[in-house]
Amino acid sequence: MKLNLFLCCVAVLASTMISSAQGNNNPSFTRGFAGNVEAGVLFKDGFAGEYVNVSSGCNILPGLFAGVGIGIKNQKFHSLSDVNSFLVPTFIQLRYSFLNKSISPFINLKGGLISDYSPSLKDMPEGFRDSGCGHFFRVGIGVDYKRYSFYVGDDWSQVSYSTASRNNYAWTFGVGFKF
């Protein structure tokens, strides 16, 4: 009797381990609500600033995330000034993770609107005394490790002010966490 009970317990434990081994190793392959938070730095001819983004959405297909987000960028945007701009992007994000493994490469696309809410606009050169708005696009590649992400990318922003508009390109390096 004790041997049969022991064998039943071993069988239950073995089936539990086998079924969990066949599950999703990558959170991107679990359908339903998903979100991520990421932080990183921008480089253009040296250090150009930092950013934080939060996005939420849905894993609509295994490996494919679609969502919306908002962020904060503190970036030297104007080449005519040493003052950093306080930029707020709102965006749509598409992200595809290639493998259902603990370690998986991915591609990431973001695009949307960006606004300049710099508190020091009065210190900007003439013609930049109003808050500007425009659009941005970011493409990146990286590696997921369980719920963490490490990536590099290219960030392009265009902001229009009352008298002029400015474009800016920067390299991004960041880390993220998926929830």
Segments predicted by a language model, with ranges:
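N-terminal leader regions
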Residues: 164, 175-178
